[in-house]
UniProtKB/Swiss-Prot annotation:
Transmembrane segments: none annotated. Binds 1 Mg(2+) ion per subunit. InterPro entries: Pantoate_hydroxy_MeTrfase, Pyrv/PenolPyrv_kinase-like_dom, Pyrv_kinase-like_dom_sf. It catalyses: 3-methyl-2-oxobutanoate + (6R)-5,10-methylene-5,6,7,8-tetrahydrofolate + H2O = 2-dehydropantoate + (6S)-5,6,7,8-tetrahydrofolate. The active site is at residue 181. This is 3-methyl-2-oxobutanoate hydroxymethyltransferase. GO terms for molecular function: 3-methyl-2-oxobutanoate hydroxymethyltransferase activity; magnesium ion binding. GO terms for cellular component: cytoplasm. The gene is panB. Pfam families: Pantoate_transf (PF02548). Homodecamer; pentamer of dimers. It comes from Shigella flexneri. Catalyzes the reversible reaction in which hydroxymethyl group from 5,10-methylenetetrahydrofolate is transferred onto alpha-ketoisovalerate to form ketopantoate. PANTHER family: 3-METHYL-2-OXOBUTANOATE HYDROXYMETHYLTRANSFERASE. Its EC number is 2.1.2.11.
Length: 264
């Protein structure tokens, strides 16, 4: 199978072809996803909650991300693999480069970092040194203590304009992908249309170029609070492979996320 690349996603955006992505943390699920044609995966710091059992993503280390990245890469050798740089792993551009090198050596094709215009120098430095960057705006879980919880971001003119400005700044600095989390559909549409790079949404309506879900949310195995934007595809199909195929099909057709999964 031909490898999926950043250029593949760029072509999807140009062709207005929606695409599905998912988090993965181990060999077995990565192989299953790849076998079903789901070829864009993220080793997310969400593993702190879903795999390690913490109440936030903050305890996750670069070593944790590298370990899981290597496992996922073995299961899905041809996927486009993103890896999060966890909390405090990119406080300076130099630190970001050192930690990005670690996860790239483990098998990542691209690193994802959370934050807006303050990251411009970091994004430039990484991009100039052949480390592709995915930005992450909106609800950025590493900032949970600043936000005072997991809340929708970008409501109101000032907040929405700031997020659009952040998105444009990240793109100008060299970011090649952007994740938008928990923002109003109207803002997600503005940002997706304003950027030349692909935008992946989670809790951002069906107006973005792609969608991502935490694997555990997509299969209904999350303990505790279930996000509004989540859908349990396993409950509808009763078979995990069929659930993966249904998730992909609903994203590609624009059925998921529906109005009931979206914010305004």
């Amino acid at each position: 199978m031909k490898p999926t690349t950043i250029a593949s996603l760029q072509k999807y955006k140009q062709d207005k072809k929606r695409f599905a992505t998912i988090t993965a943390y181990d060999y077995s699920f990565a192989k299953l996803f790849a076998d079903e044609g789901l070829n864009v995966m993220l080793v997310g710091d969400s593993l702190g909650m879903t795999v390690q059992g913490h109440d936030s993503t903050l305890p996750v280390t670069v070593a944790d991300i590298a370990y899981h990245t290597a496992a996922v890469r073995r299961g899905a050798p041809n996927c486009l693999l993103l890896a999060d740089l966890p909390f405090m792993a990119y406080a300076t551009p130099e630190q970001a480069f050192e930690n990005a090198a670690t996860v790239m050596r483990a098998g990542a094709n691209m690193v994802k970092i959370e934050g807006g215009e303050w990251l411009v120098e970091t994004v430039k430095m990484l991009t100039e040194r052949a480390v592709p960057v995915c930005g992450h705006l909106g609800l950025t879980p590493q900032s949970v203590n600043i936000f005072g919880g997991y809340k929708v971001q970008g409501r109101g003119n000032e907040a929405s304009d700031r997020l659009l400005s952040d998105a444009l700044a990240l793109e100008a600095a060299g970011a090649q992908l952007l994740v938008l989390e928990c923002v109003p559909v109207e803002l997600a549409k503005r940002i997706t249309e304003a950027l030349a790079i692909p935008v992946i949404g989670i809790g951002a309506g069906n107006v973005t170029d792609g969608q991502i879900l935490v694997m555990h949310d997509a299969f209904g195995i999350t303990g505790g609070h279930i996000p509004k934007f989540a859908k349990n595809f396993l409950a509808e199909t009763g078979d995990i492979r069929a659930a993966v195929r249904q998730y992909m099909a609903e994203v590609e057709s624009g059925v998921y996320p529906g109005e009931e999964h979206s914010f305004h």
